[in-house]
Amino acid sequence: PDLPELVSSLVSKGNLEATTEPREAAARASIHVVIVPTPITDKNEPDLSILDAVVEDIGRGLDPGDLVLIECTVPPQTTERRVLPALEEVSGLSRDAFGLAFCPERTSSGRALKDIRGAYPKVVGGVDDESTQAARAIYEELNSEGVLPVSDATTAEAVKVFEGLYRDVNIGLANEL
């Protein structure tokens, strides 16, 4: 609800542009928000290839001072052990030249705008304190329910996994009743 009107308004004001060239978009942005699916393989393992491709595109356009925010469901430690080294390698920048945080998406189907604006507090955890504070500042502008900074990206990733587990257990329990 309200998404078509919001998009139309932002486009007409010149505040929203679209491109089919991800590297161009990465080069023009200073805040990069990654929300991609994480499919499961035949071996019941997360397939992170989509995330890897997006991170590579962002890395090619990453500039000092940029902030990368990962929102998709990933195994704990993915941000620190997979995304951070990939961004450093592709961009040629050192860890302290850009920000990186995990900020789990917390939306329900059909309610995305309402949820993003403040149905739930936003959890944020960076690879360092500066990244956590930068993510916090961004999401405080967007989320009326506030921001919950956690100790690090791995903790934020675990929050996302446990929220999904909680939901799945409740659905399973309801199906058994």
Residue ranges and their predicted role:
Residues 1-176:
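Structural/interface elements that position substrates and couple domains in central-metabolism enzymes
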